[in-house]
Regions:
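N-terminal strand-loop-strand
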Residues: 85-128, 155, 159-162
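Active-site-adjacent beta-strand/loop module that shapes the phosphate/pyrophosphate-binding cleft
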Residues: 108, 166-190, 205, 222-231
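Acidic, metal-coordinating catalytic segment for phosphate/diphosphate chemistry
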Residues: 60-103
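Nudix hydrolase/Nudix homology domain
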Residues: 2-30, 44, 121-126, 135, ...
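The catalytic Nudix box helix
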Residues: 127-160, 181-182, 189
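Conserved beta-strand-loop-alpha-helix junction that forms the acyl-donor binding cleft
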Residues: 51-59, 119, 133
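Short hydrophobic/aromatic beta-strand or adjacent loop that forms the aromatic wall/cage
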Residues: 10-12, 76-80, 101-103, 176-180, ...
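Conserved GNAT acetyl-CoA-binding A-motif
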Residues: 42-53
């Protein structure tokens, strides 16, 4: 009995371990069937094979490795393996290799800046609140959530002030892009997160400028200078517009 498979527009197929019958999940039966299937797929000129293995079916992974399947990516309950069948160079897309994060530069009506210090990490000085995106979030949603989680301040994102790109993050072969957003505060009461935040405060520019180099980075001072230029320009800057592309909702960012 052949595998249940789905095809894609690029000449590839996907097999999911959850679709295997109990008999097909037996290691000997699976090993025999995957060998036969690879021969059949080559005759059919299938290009790439995607095998999605649920964690409860992980006993079949060695059989796939023995037949040339490579690890593509993993999630908490699933491992995806691939095999390229033609003799030509593999053109299967690689998995996501860049992390996204966002933070907020929040200035209140008294021109005080919302800053915080973390409980742990390589840098324990003052910084703008922010962190990594959760799945499904856009940039502004991440910045809004992170500012609130770390400081208790609710905000509305107005524009992207800047972003920085790192070719290497804490994970091997994974980059990092971090967006700093201009945020409008909806409240000023502080409720720091006890697990993440050592301290958060509304700081005056005089207080910020008085900190030693160990407690404030040149980056933060430069961003405050950039914020001042953005505010004095009266322009919207890099702002977002919701739109629909090919049936998918997305955010477009325009610099005006």
């Amino acid at each position: 009995m052949a595998f249940k498979e789905s095809t894609d527009v690029f000449g590839g197929i996907t097999v999911r371990s959850r679709d295997l019958s109990p008999d097909q999940k037996q290691l000997d039966a699976f090993s025999s069937l995957i060998t036969q299937s690879l021969e059949d797929w080559k005759k059919r000129r299938v290009r790439g094979v995607w095998m999605r293995v649920d964690i409860q079916d992980s006993h079949i992974i060695p059989a796939l490795v023995e037949r040339g399947f490579m690890f593509h990516h993993t999630q908490p309950h699933c491992l995806v393996m691939t095999k390229w069948l033609p003799e030509t160079p593999c053109t299967l897309p690689i998995y996501a290799h860049t992390l996204i994060g966002a933070g907020g530069i929040v200035v209140d009506s008294q021109d005080r800046v919302l800053m915080m210090r973390e409980n742990r990490g390589h840098y324990l000085g003052w910084k703008f609140p922010g962190g990594a995106s959760d799945p499904g979030e856009n940039i502004f949603e991440t910045a809004t959530r992170e500012v609130f989680e770390e400081t208790g301040v609710k905000t509305v994102a107005k524009a992207v002030l800047c972003f920085r790109q790192l070719q290497r993050s804490q994970f091997e072969n994974v980059g990092d892009i971090y967006f700093l957003c201009v945020m409008e505060a909806l409240n000023v009461e502080l409720k720091p997160c006890p697990s993440e935040t050592a301290e958060c405060r509304w700081l005056t520019r005089e207080e910020i400028n008085s900190f030693p180099d160990t407690m404030i980075r040149d980056f933060h001072l430069e961003m405050l200078s950039r914020y001042d230029k953005w505010k004095s320009s009266g322009r919207p800057g890099c702002h977002s517009v919701s739109c629909n592309l090919s049936g998918k909702n997305c955010m477009m960012f325009y610099v005006d």
